[in-house]
């Protein structure tokens, strides 16, 4: 079955809040075999909402609305749908009692407009709001399914999980959708696509969807099957074919981000890390500390932005700074080796370069050096030539640091 998600609220069109509900619902619907082909956003306007309903009825089996169930005059979703379906709005006694009790407990006046939140379409399946007041509802009419949900994510998400998904499963074929995301770094999207183009062209079940995001490339493999284990087998076969070709750039699955993978490997190896950050200005260390329990492996870092700090704290020779420059292979090497020694760590990693927008030391923006010094191993410096805005260059540099750290740890 096909679904359309219609988000109602002028605040969405004004950009005052992000439509995170659509992302959540799309992912959940896909997992039970319901395809989402359209996302629509419409303001708090009866006529425009009616047009959106008519358009959705032409192209979707399931219409899911978020927002517009509240007590104010511009909350008009259920009124508009009631008119469209020629159905009455009636009070749901459980919801009415819940709202009434809330106002009694808080000592506030229970006004007529607040009663409005307890109105539901006559004959609808009512979804209790365990985290708010306005209930949701589901209606099956004219060979279409209409789902009305509250707008606040803290109310909508638990309502969907507890009540809406079981309701929707009555209308599905029982076919499950199973997805797995393969994460790659160090290879561009176009280069990766060339390597697996024949697999993409021949995709049926599972499908392969590439996506580039800030220096990384992901491949989402999606299979449909009534049996989850059979869907997993379909995906595993395609994954094996992909990794035969580009496995050297693969580092993880789904939400396994680079910084998480690198820190987990540090923990398993029982090694400690220190960082010297010039270009990145603390970005790398910040991402390190996003991982729980990282104090067991992270000694700390030095933000050595000024050359005085490079020279006097991390002992980069003055001659290197004058001759090679702060943005150089030699400087990166000294920074990595000396931060390791100063902070008594097993591994030192360093970042120096030009973030832009202007050149520095006659070196163009995007000129970057990442140093990596591991005890009992020769120091390695990775030169990079990155593009993008100042912030993008800094963020991508930190990612390259995690990538090279992860790959080096795999070899030890």
Swiss-Prot record:
InterPro entries: CinA (IPR050101), CinA-like_C (IPR036653), CinA_C (IPR008136), CinA_KH (IPR041424), Competence-induced_CinA (IPR008135), MoaB/Mog-like_dom_sf (IPR036425), MoaB/Mog_dom (IPR001453). SMART domains: MoCF_biosynth. Disulfide bonds: none annotated. It comes from the Bacteria. NCBIfam families: cinA_nterm, molyb_syn, PncC_domain, PRK00549.1. Belongs to the CinA family. HAMAP family: CinA_B (MF_00226_B). This is Putative competence-damage inducible protein. It comes from Bacillus cereus (strain B4264). The lineage of its organism: Bacteria, Bacillati, Bacillota, Bacilli, Bacillales.
């Amino acid at each position: 079955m096909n679904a359309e998600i219609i988000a109602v609220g002028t605040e969405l069109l004004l950009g005052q809040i992000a439509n995170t509900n659509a992302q959540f619902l799309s992912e959940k619907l896909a997992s039970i075999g319901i395809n989402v082909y359209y996302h629509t956003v419409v303001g708090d306007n009866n006529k425009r909402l009616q047009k959106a309903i008519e358009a959705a009825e032409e192209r979707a089996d399931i219409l899911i609305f978020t927002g517009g169930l509240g007590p104010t005059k511009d909350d008009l979703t259920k009124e508009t749908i009631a008119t469209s379906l020629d159905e009455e709005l009636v009070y749901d006694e459980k919801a009415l009692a819940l709202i009434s009790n809330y106002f009694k407990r808080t000592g506030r006046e229970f006004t007529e407009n607040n009663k409005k939140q307890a109105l539901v379409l006559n004959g609808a399946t009512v979804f209790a709001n365990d985290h708010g007041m306005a209930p949701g509802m589901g209606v099956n009419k004219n060979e279409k399914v209409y789902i009305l949900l509250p707008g606040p994510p803290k109310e909508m998400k638990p309502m969907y999980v507890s009540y809406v998904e079981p309701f929707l499963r009555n209308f599905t074929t029982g076919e499950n959708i199973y997805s797995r995301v393969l994460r790659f770094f160090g290879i561009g999207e176009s280069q990766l696509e060339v390597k697996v183009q024949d697999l993409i062209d021949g995709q049926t079940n599972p499908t392969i969807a590439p996506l580039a995001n800030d220096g990384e490339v992901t491949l989402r493999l999606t299979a449909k099957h009534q049996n989850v284990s059979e869907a997993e087998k379909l995906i595993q076969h395609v994954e094996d074919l992909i990794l035969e070709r580009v496995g050297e750039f693969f580092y993880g699955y789904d939400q396994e981000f680079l910084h998480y993978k690198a820190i987990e490997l540090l923990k398993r190896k029982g090694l400690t890390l220190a960082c010297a950050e010039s270009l990145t200005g603390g970005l790398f260390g910040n991402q390190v500390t996003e991982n729980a329990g990282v104090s067991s492996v992270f000694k700390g870092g030095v933000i050595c932005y000024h050359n005085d700090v490079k020279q006097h704290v991390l002992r980069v020779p003055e001659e290197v700074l004058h001759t090679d420059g702060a943005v150089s292979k030699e400087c990166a090497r000294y920074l990595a080796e000396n931060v390791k020694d100063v902070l008594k760590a097993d591994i030192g990693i360093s970042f120096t370069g030009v973030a832009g927008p202007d050149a520095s030391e006659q070196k163009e923006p995007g000129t970057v050096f990442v140093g990596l010094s591991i005890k009992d191993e020769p120091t390695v410096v990775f030169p990079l030539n990155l593009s993008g805005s100042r912030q993008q260059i800094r963020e991508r540099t930190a990612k390259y640091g995690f990538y090279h750290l992860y790959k080096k740890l795999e070899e030890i």
